[in-house]
Swiss-Prot record:
Protein family per UniProt: Belongs to the UPF0122 family.
Record's function text: Might take part in the signal recognition particle (SRP) pathway. This is inferred from the conservation of its genetic proximity to ftsY/ffh. May be a regulatory protein.
Name the UniProt record assigns to this protein: UPF0122 protein lmo1802
Organism: Listeria monocytogenes serovar 1/2a (strain ATCC BAA-679 / EGD-e)
Family matches, as Pfam families: UPF0122
């Protein structure tokens, strides 16, 4: 469950602008704020089942966006390469403060 929650949070970060206002709200409450389905249903005055169905459809939409656009996959690949590069430079004592700062800036561009 923890892995799924992390994945949904990352997908939400990348693709939230493609979601409706309602989808954003439900997913935000559920995954980011850790509300239960019942708490969200009470907040929006709808059934627990309506919240569940909407969140499931939104999860499917987020996965479809990722399948087509691949933003999370590319981000994870870049992070892995930056980590490898940093380790290689550190190992060879090439990692001075200026290079370290540049690597950090590259990581933070997205």
């Amino acid at each position: 469950m923890f892995e799924k929650t992390n994945r949904m949070n990352l997908l939400f970060d990348f693709y939230q602008e493609l979601l409706t206002t309602k989808q954003k709200a439900y997913v935000s409450f559920y995954y980011l704020d850790d509300y239960s389905l019942g708490e969200i249903a009470e907040e929006f005055e709808v059934s627990r089942q309506a919240i569940y169905d909407n969140i499931k459809r939104t999860e499917e939409s987020l996965e479809k966006y990722e399948e087509k656009l691949g933003m999370l996959k590319k981000y994870q690949q870049r992070e892995k390469l930056f980590t490898q590069l940093e380790a290689q430079l550190t190992k060879k004592n090439f990692l001075d403060e200026q290079v370290k700062d540049t690597l950090e800036q590259l990581k933070n561009i997205d």
